[in-house]
Amino acid sequence: MWPGVWPGAGTLFGPTLGKLVDQIRAAGYQPEQVDEILITHMHPDHVGGLVADGRMVFPNATVRADTREGGFWLSQANLDQAPAEAKGFFQGAMASLKPYVDAGRFKAISADEELVPGIKAVATHGHTKGHRNYVVESKGQKLVLWGDLMHVAAVQFADPSVTIQFDTDQKAARVSPPS
């Protein structure tokens, strides 16, 4: 298993980005070898790299994200009701995940659980409705992988109660634990 965690924005934000596949190949791997992708949340800068030209970049991967996250960002009704400035977030998530959903390669996470041996999903809602961290444990060591739990380290490490405009639930974002 070669799990990927953050597919990034792909080329959604311009042609100078989206070099993940090149970097995977430079490391001696192929995108087809990635079999697990763990999504912290579905903002375009975190899921845009899942697709290229509408096709799955990682065709053998199971993409996992929180049930609430998928239910919110992949909902046509929510897109239709979203303010104009938020529609791009919904459209980006839908375009990025649709090929995986259609292929049966999207799996929702509904609880804090071990997804594969040594990797556990942990709810850290606040930045988005279904934000999650992933805790990797092996040989007595622990690594916490997070998305946008922290935005400005110099400010938020000193005062974790500081949130940002993009946190959908400011109160929950203040108390989300890192692990």
Segments and roles (model prediction):
Residues M1-G14:
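Surface-exposed, interaction-prone regions with an acidic/low-complexity signature
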Residues P7-G8, G49-V51, S75-Q76, Q156:
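Short, solvent-exposed loop/turn and secondary-structure capping segments
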Residues T11-D22, K129-S179:
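Cap/insert and terminal regions of metallo-dependent hydrolase folds
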Residues P15-Y29, Q33-D45, N60-A123, A172-S179:
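Metallo-beta-lactamase
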Residues W2-P3, M42-P44, E69-F72, H151:
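Solvent-exposed loop/turn segments at secondary-structure junctions
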Residues A52-N60:
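Basic, amphipathic juxtamembrane/active-site segments
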Residues M1-P3, G48, M56, S96, ...:
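Catalytic core of the metallo-beta-lactamase
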